[in-house]
């Protein structure tokens, strides 16, 4: 896994192979990438994430690392800690999912076209799934089904090593002292193949293999016996993963285990195609990631059905995000305003931008007061106190 940064100046020879992606050439001979997102190079089996430029602080990635270090294999002198590696994967996966969800929310956005709404480019269509999608699905299953793994392990070990008295009495001769028999060779329950555990061991073997490339943290509270990562890599290279899964498919009927089998089969099928170079390079990249970020924030906190005149105000102003939340002074709801268009990178916060931000709140307050004065019967938020006639403070950030 390699990490690049949007708009950071690299030397041409420092960039990994990015077929189909043209970096911007600078006058001094350097190059920079105008994208944020995910790229998988099939030829080198290398996963590449391009992170937003906002993470470059004082020419350092996260104010700690030389960005050029993160686009190379780790050196012995400057290795990343395990926590840093896990953080980089989590952040990169989050950005990838944000772009993918943006594409789903905007079906008219032609993802293979650089002329789309936010400049999204890639091979990932509506029904396409990348190798990273399969990895994230396996991690999600592990996170959400810890109780299943614990239950199967508990059932398996219940009664294990317990004496099988019927078999012991039938097959062994006791030592009799007085009238009391003593059995010196006790028979225990025969160990049978646990097919549930067989699938789970294969699942964790797969996660251990992927952990070498993506450096994520795997939650595993039980000590399942797993295969070495190089054995899993060999199975993928030889196409044995899907053959093995087809062989054991008929042994699973529990819904969760059938789901796990399907996830594993989908991953190995894709991984074997990649290993045999039968698929194109994967990419999901976006220009102007701030547009994706704004859309994500609006999806998380924005109101889907707002009265006309609140988001698009009468004086021509358009609020980025507006939503209902509890008032700061009582138990009623009021509108919270979130808008950052006057706080752009590199610009200072002056009187002009402060006035425009305040105008947003004044317009929202006036909108509700007008409804109150007209005696409108439709639901509206009360912004004037009945006793003091003072205005309810409106958060504006």
Language-model regions, residue ranges each:
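Terminal, charged accessory segments of proteins
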Residues: 1-242, 256-274
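Loop-centered beta-sheet repeat module
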Residues: 240-298
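Catalytic core segments in nucleotide and nucleic-acid processing enzymes
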Residues: 1-49, 273-397
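Short, charged/polar micro-motifs that form catalytic or ligand-binding hotspots
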Residues: 185-200, 250-254, 283-291, 346-351
């Amino acid at each position: 896994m390699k990490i690049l940064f949007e708009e950071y100046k690299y030397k041409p020879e420092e960039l990994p192979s990015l077929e189909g992606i043209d970096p911007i050439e600078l006058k001094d001979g350097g190059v920079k990438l105008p994208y944020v997102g995910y790229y998988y190079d099939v030829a080198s089996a290398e996963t590449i994430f391009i992170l937003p430029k906002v993470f470059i602080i004082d020419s350092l990635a996260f104010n700690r690392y030389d960005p050029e270090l993160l686009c190379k294999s780790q050196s012995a002198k400057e290795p990343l800690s395990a926590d840093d590696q896990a953080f980089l994967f989590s952040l990169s996966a989050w950005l990838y999912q944000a772009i993918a969800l943006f594409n789903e929310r905007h079906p008219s956005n032609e993802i293979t076209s650089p002329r789309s709404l936010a400049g999204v480019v890639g091979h990932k269509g509506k029904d396409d799934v990348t190798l990273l999608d399969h990895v994230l699905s396996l991690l999600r299953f592990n996170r959400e089904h810890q109780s299943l793994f614990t239950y199967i392990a508990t059932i398996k070990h219940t009664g294990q090593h317990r004496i099988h008295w019927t078999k012991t009495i039938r097959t062994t001769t006791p030592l009799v002292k007085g009238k009391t028999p003593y059995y010196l060779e006790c028979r225990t329950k025969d160990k049978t193949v646990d097919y549930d555990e067989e699938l789970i061991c294969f699942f964790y073997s797969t996660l251990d293999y992927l952990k070498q490339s993506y450096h994520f943290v795997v939650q595993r509270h039980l000590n399942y016996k797993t295969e070495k990562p190089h054995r899993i890599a060999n199975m993928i290279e030889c196409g044995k993963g899907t053959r093995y899964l087809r062989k054991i498919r008929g042994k699973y009927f529990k819904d969760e285990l059938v789901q796990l089998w399907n996830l594993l089969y989908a991953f190995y099928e894709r991984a074997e195609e990649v290993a045999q170079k039968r698929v194109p390079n994967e990419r999901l990249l976006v220009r102007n990631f701030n547009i994706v970020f704004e859309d994500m924030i609006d999806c998380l906190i924005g109101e889907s059905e707002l009265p006309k005149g609140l988001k698009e105000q009468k004086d021509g102003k358009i609020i980025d995000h507006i939503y209902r939340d509890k008032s700061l002074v009582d138990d009623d709801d009021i509108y919270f305003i979130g808008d950052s268009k006057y706080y752009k990178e590199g610009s200072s916060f002056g009187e002009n931008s402060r006035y425009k931000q305040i105008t947003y709140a004044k317009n929202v307050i006036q909108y509700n007061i007008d409804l109150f004065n007209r005696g409108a019967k439709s639901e509206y938020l009360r912004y004037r106190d009945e006793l003091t006639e003072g205005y309810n403070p409106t958060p504006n950030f």
